Amino acid sequence: MTQPIIELHQVTKRYADNTILSNINLTLESGKFYTLLGPSGCGKTTILRTIAGFTDATTGDILFAGKRINDVPANKRNVNTVFQDYALFPHMTVAENVAFGLTLQKRPKSEIAERVNQALRLVQLADYGDRAISALSGGQQQRIAIARAIVMQPQVLLLDEPLSALDAKLRRQMQYELRDLQQRLGITFLFVTHDQEEALAMSDEIFVMNQGEILQSGSPVDIYDEPINHFVADFIGESNILPGKMIDDFQVAFGGHQFECADAGIPVNEPVEIVIRPEDLTLTDLAHAKLTVTINTQLFRGDYYEIAATDGLGNDWLIHSVNPAEDGDQIGLTFRPQDLHVMRFGEKEAEFDARLETYEGTEDDRFDET
Amino acid sequence: MKQKFTQLYLIVVFIILYAPIVFLIAYSFSQGDTMTNYHGFTWRHYQTLFSDSRMLAIVANTLLVALLSSLIATLIGTLGALGINRTTKRVTRESLLTLNNVLMVSPDVIIGASFLIFFTMLKIPLGFGSVLLSHIAFEIPIVVLMVLPRLREMSASMLDAAQDLGATTRQLLSQVIIPFISPGIFAGFFMALTYSLDDFAVTFFVTGNGFSTLSVEIYSRARQGINLEINALSGVMFLFSLLLVGGYYWIQQVSQKRKQRKRGAIS
Amino acid sequence: MIALTKRKTWLYFIPYGLWLALFVIAPVALIIYQSFFDLGHHFTLANYSTYFASATYLKMTVNSVWYALLITLFTGLISYPTAYFLHQLKHRQFWLLLVILPTWINILLKAYAFIGIFSQAGLANQFLTFIGIGPQQILFTNASFIFVATYIQIPFMILPIFNALDDLNPAFINASRDLGASNWQTFRRVIFPLTLPGVKAGVQAVFIPSLSLFMLTRLIGGNKVITLGTAIEEHFLTTMNWGMGSTIGVVLIIAMIIVMTLTGDQKPKGGAPR
């Protein structure tokens, strides 16, 4: 395994009685796109600031390429930040902003000019060097903020919710561009966001955070398909979360019935929660139904109908269907065993991973025919 | 109808505001010796003024005190504003601001009288030194008040960004903070200058016998009655104020234009 | 920001700190200290007992406050409509500049101008003669003192009211109209309450100086009106009774604190309603 570029070992941050970060461990490898994802106030920006050097960790170590950098001031760290409000210097032109860090390093004028031009080309604003910051649109300011950081050739680029001030269309475009930029530069990006779609779309690996803790880390697909607990399942994507009970390995009961599932290694009769994504539910006639629900309302979302329904036990269901349903109708729902995901209460990420080890492989054989 | 009333009201107010000034300057060109009955045009009073060596020395003193005190007050006030802006505790900041504003709201006589006691106790001789110190003292708070809002406008992330790009504390100050707040510093200097030129009461208390500024001189001459040399002086001072205001707005316009030129490049 | 900026930077704060100690705290302390000493430099409470026992001093104080109130009232009555109308003009910033410009003329020159205007054969009496009233003694009367003081203070009242009007979100006015309020109702129920902080700032800027305008009482009022400021100046520079002067100074400081408290912004601190 190669040397990780950034490591956090048991980092905590406290202000008086408030714990902002508790026991954060994380490892970032070179050249990957990482995302810290969580609701506002979960501590994700604080992690970014401890890595950048704007905030001290109360305890724990921050390592850069294996060396402890807790006591290295921000201006001596080889990481750069793109700020949420861009933080461009209003009294300087675009080029002066981008050149700022290089000027402080007293680089030769020709080198500065060339690197500034190169950085501006990278963000597709090559001709904008002479403009005032106030003359740029939000999207352009965003790009300049990125150019100003990457011109420093950092090994790690920290991005603090950089897209949050942009409109939806521009944000989607910037997602592609950021991903593209990261791959071209080949450096590590650590991206902070509260927008799960953004995180799923761009990241190699996501850290889901809540209340100062990292709850789960993994690839976007892993986290979407196998959320570790109620919070993660609810925060990422839309989901139906129902109380249930483990009957046996690969057998779970909920909604008054017993179903085949893809999870094992949980003690028999343990109360659990079951996650089913709305797009995994299929409308069917009552004869083929695994569950029967009554349609309450539906909204047309363009590429699908979002249907709200209630089952006989009073559980609410959210269904994404290509075909519309009729309000008030009784209708059948069906799903595949691997569409169910069983979550244990209070299970930690390490325990979850260990349990998965015990039955993985068998799972793939079982449902091959479907 | 309503429009008419509004206009009439404003016209009357402006006439009242400017009548005394126009009256004063008009009579500086009158051949008589009193401010009654205009006696025809003359430059005589201006000639008297410009050959009055005592008056010219006082003008020089006044300008020297104003410039010197404003420069020093701007320096100290800016540093003070930086300090106040750095305080994190709300209580500390509020009490510093309250103390800062004491001299802003105190009546001139209180400032003058208390400074007089202060200088006498420290055995500082009354004259140029005491006047200069007093002017610096009452100019500092206005500089702080002009600089602070600019400092507050400065976002914390901008300072983080500068550090992130490698700026040391010194570079942070010289390349980011000072350029950013320079409009505030400039306005502070300017306000300090006008406070100094305008002050009468404080100077009157702490000036002693040997030293005089324009305000004090005008007061003592006005108590002796009408003297059209003072009218001529007010003409000169009005022109000077106009130039100062004009210059101030011109500089603001230029910096605005510079911004706009850059902005204009977009289309 | 961490360690990087914490160190040594407090050195920059020293000149300002010295100023606070020597020119803000010390002088106030000294004037209070001095008020407890008599002419022979002995500690005494006599200054205060003299002040509160003497009809002359008390009458002077009441007079001074009364004149300051009148000046503030007249200034406000003239300034609010001026600021309001001014704010409706197209080039309002330019007109505001014209209001501020006279404040750049030395106050003594303006007072001096009125000596000319109000003199026996001056402009004002020529006008009175012209309309048939005949010449009057105008200079050295209480009325002339109030007139000139009001004249001098008007811009200082207009400015904060204008700024308050400028800060007012026009959407509030539209909302009020939308809800059926007439122009007058909109003014009384929306505009005036929301610009009250400007009026209070104006009162602060006018009332306190009006208590202490000693040069106007000398030049225009002809020593008929004795304000607190005049009394202080008299004691410090003429009779050299600094103890008594300081005592009146302390009274003036207390008056100032009362005015500041009454007109201070009553934003509920900590959200507790009062």
Curated annotation (Swiss-Prot), chain A:
Q: How does it sit in the membrane?
A: Peripheral membrane protein
Q: Which domain of life is it from?
A: Bacteria
**Residues in ABC transporter domain copies:** 6-236
What cellular component GO annotations does this protein have?
ATP-binding cassette (ABC) transporter complex
Which InterPro entries does the protein's record reference? AAA+_ATPase, ABC_SmlMolc_Importer, ABC_transporter-like_ATP-bd, ABC_transporter-like_CS, Mo/tungstate-bd_C_term_dom, P-loop_NTPase, PotA-like, PotA_ATP-bd
Q: Which reaction does it catalyse?
A: ATP + H2O + polyamine-[polyamine-binding protein]Side 1 = ADP + phosphate + polyamineSide 2 + [polyamine-binding protein]Side 1
Which residues does ATP bind? 38-45
A GO MF annotation of the entry reads: ATP binding
Please give the chief subcellular localization of this protein: membrane
- Provide the function of this protein: Part of the ABC transporter complex PotABCD involved in spermidine/putrescine import. Responsible for energy coupling to the transport system.
Write down the PANTHER family for this protein, in alphabetical order: SPERMIDINE/PUTRESCINE IMPORT ATP-BINDING PROTEIN POTA, SPERMIDINE_PUTRESCINE IMPORT ATP-BINDING PROTEIN POTA
Instruction: Describe the family membership recorded for this protein in Swiss-Prot or TrEMBL.
Output: Belongs to the ABC transporter superfamily. Spermidine/putrescine importer (TC 3.A.1.11.1) family.
Q: What is this protein called?
A: Spermidine/putrescine import ATP-binding protein PotA
Q: Which organism is it from?
A: Levilactobacillus brevis (strain ATCC 367 / BCRC 12310 / CIP 105137 / JCM 1170 / LMG 11437 / NCIMB 947 / NCTC 947)
